[in-house]
Amino acid sequence: MQEAVTSKVEEVAQRVAQSEGLELVEVEVKGGGSARLVRISIDKPEGVTHADCQTVSDKVGEILEAEDAIPGHYTLEVSSPGVERKLLKPQDYQRFHGQKAKITVREEVDGRRTWEGTLAGFADGVISLEVAPGEIRRLPFDQVKKANLKFEW
């Protein structure tokens, strides 16, 4: 049931995001009953505005209500992915080339599962991460368990 709801929300959110010139980053559906939370993350190269979030929220909400896509009550939340956004797609590693990231892989690479460094490239399903000046670790994209940008204070 939860997968069907998530799939429907993704389809609607993708359609709305594209029509508004936005990228759909992620859809999460958590909980159930009256405590269900539907979280949509959107982005665009110049950054997301409050108005972008409001527009997507209004349009997605209207469609979900009209189609009665989510049983019961739910809270709809639309936001930007934030400064420490998740890296979910191969394109993310190319787009954020040169930025700091933290990547956790399923199987150890050189004795470790969690790596931090600067995104140095992405090719043939492999992420290049500069973990020290001149020291590159190659991490298979299909082994990534979790990855996000790291904001430097």
Swiss-Prot record:
Q: Which Pfam families match?
A: DUF150_C, RimP_N
Reading the lineage from the top rank, the first entry is Bacteria
What's this chain's function? Required for maturation of 30S ribosomal subunits.
Task: Give the GO biological process terms.
Answer: ribosomal small subunit assembly; translation
> Mind telling me what this protein is named?
Ribosome maturation factor RimP
Is-annotated flag, keyword Cytoplasm? yes
Keywords, ordered alphabetically? Cytoplasm, Ribosome biogenesis
Compartments reported by the entry = Cytoplasm
Q: Which family does it belong to?
A: Belongs to the RimP family.
GO cellular component term, pick one: cytosol
Annotated organism of origin: Solibacter usitatus (strain Ellin6076)
